[in-house]
UniProtKB/Swiss-Prot annotation:
Gene: pth
Pfam entry (one): Pept_tRNA_hydro
Summary of the function given for this chain in its UniProt record: Hydrolyzes ribosome-free peptidyl-tRNAs (with 1 or more amino acids incorporated), which drop off the ribosome during protein synthesis, or as a result of ribosome stalling.
Active site: 22
Lineage, top ranks: Bacteria, Bacillati, Actinomycetota, Actinomycetes, Propionibacteriales
Chain sites annotated for binding tRNA: 17, 78, 80, 126
Entry annotated with the keyword Transport: no
Location relative to the cell: Cytoplasm
Protein name: Peptidyl-tRNA hydrolase
Length: 200
């Protein structure tokens, strides 16, 4: 069965970036894979790691519906080239922008906050900027995880590329799990229902 959705979690590749604020989107993909009992694998010629799986309404507390076939994806490019991988995979799988979900960090939301939206600008986020450029549209769904702004005069780039302190990791883990719930809700129940439930 052809996939009906593509979900990408933005982040930078390699262990150097594991646990950073900028990689929280990729952490959500890892959580969705864990729930599905799946692992990402390199996709030949597409500069991405991905897995095709099925999501159902089992964990959402809503009536059962037909499971949806989705591609869960993490780019193997750096953040500012995310659009290269997204456009390749979307084109290959026949996914249109309205069935693309991009999960990413958002400095204009406080830590722990979650916001779902469709369309809009890139707000200086280089991953979103690259995806918009390569798809030639910003008309895709975003799951935005708040990481907050840096204190004082710290460079925002240094802030998002820093690892989350140990004392905040539990809170971040809760946020990642909630964002994974939100992705499942968008796919099974639709964006409006998911926004009503998860926007904070």
């Amino acid at each position: 069965m052809s996939p009906s959705w593509l979900v990408i979690g933005l982040g930078n590749p390699g262990p150097r970036y594991d646990g950073t604020r900028h990689n929280v989107g990729a952490d959500v993909i890892a959580e969705l894979c864990r729930r599905a009992g799946e692992k990402l694998s390199p996709a030949r010629g597409q500069r991405a790691e991905l897995v095709r799986t099925r999501l159902s309404s089992a964990g959402l507390g809503v009536p059962a519906v037909d499971a949806q076939t989705v591609i869960l994806m993490r780019s193997r490019t750096y953040m500012n080239e995310s659009g290269i991988a997204v456009s390749k995979v979307a084109s290959f799988a026949g996914i249109t922008p309205d069935h693309l979900i991009v999960v990413h960090d958002e400095i204009d939301l406080d830590p722990g906050r979650l916001r779902l939206k469709k369309g809009g600008g890139d707000n200086g986020h280089n991953g979103l900027k690259s995806i918009r450029a390569h798809l030639r549209t910003g008309d895709f769904i975003r799951v935005r995880l708040g990481v907050g702004r840096p204190p004082g005069h710290q460079d925002p780039a240094d802030w998002v590329l820093a690892r989350v302190p140990a004392r905040q990791r539990a809170e971040m883990g809760v946020q990642v799990a909630l964002a994974a719930d939100a992705v499942e809700s968008i796919i099974i129940q639709g964006l409006a229902a998911a926004q009503n439930r998860f926007n904070s």
